[in-house]
Amino acid sequence: IIGPNGGGKTTLVKTILGLLKPIKGKIQFYREGQSTPSLRIGYLPQYTTFDRKFPISVRDVILSGLHGKHFVWHRFGTSDQQKADDIIHLLELDNCAHNAIGEISGGQRQRALIGRALVCDPEILILDEPNTYIDKKNQDKLYELLKQVNTHCAILLVSHDIGTVLRNVRNIVCVNHNVHYHPVSEVDEKLIEDSFGCPFQLVAHGQIPHRILENHTD
């Protein structure tokens, strides 16, 4: 999902999550082609605020993603603990799993929050600007991880990084008060201009597309 600030990306995501009610129309979920009232959803918000001094470990943050299926004071069983450990290993957080969440780097913290979204075995994973706090090297590793996850889980990803998005996704939703939905192969400068409301060029270095804004008055 791409589009300018204020275009409706966050509103769309919150409506899918059930945090907002649509003014008209409805959100419909499907499982294996059959309509279903809901699906398991994992969610990484764009901004996550917390008390850095709060004594909770990386492992416990990831386990907290299971509270949606248990009571808040539920004691996690062996299978839950193993699931968290598998996510920790998958995200390469083994060396800081027992560190306090406020003591680790921004990139590690972002991966821990992604782990919290993954641990519930979501059928849909919604990530709002997941590259936040993650350097370029680890961004590439993140997208490789998401490709693995995508074999058994649908992913909705909100991003301003058009170049990275075009390299790693199959379909684009352009949101700017209207919605344009296309396979990546059909995305061109005209579509992006209509979505962002200003002219720009797509320039490719090999297989890597970039965007360059042209002169405009806004």
Feature-to-residue mapping (PLM):
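H-loop (His-switch) and adjacent beta-strand-loop-beta switch element
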Residues: R170-S185
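Conserved ABC ATPase signature
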Residues: A100-I104, Q108
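Helix-to-loop junction immediately C-terminal to a conserved catalytic motif
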Residues: L17
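Conserved ABC transporter NBD signature motif
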Residues: G25-I41
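Catalytic Walker B motif of ABC-type/P-loop ATPase nucleotide-binding domains
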Residues: L125-E129
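Conserved ABC ATPase "signature" region
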Residues: L63, T78-C96
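ABC ATPase nucleotide-binding domains
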Residues: E186-D218
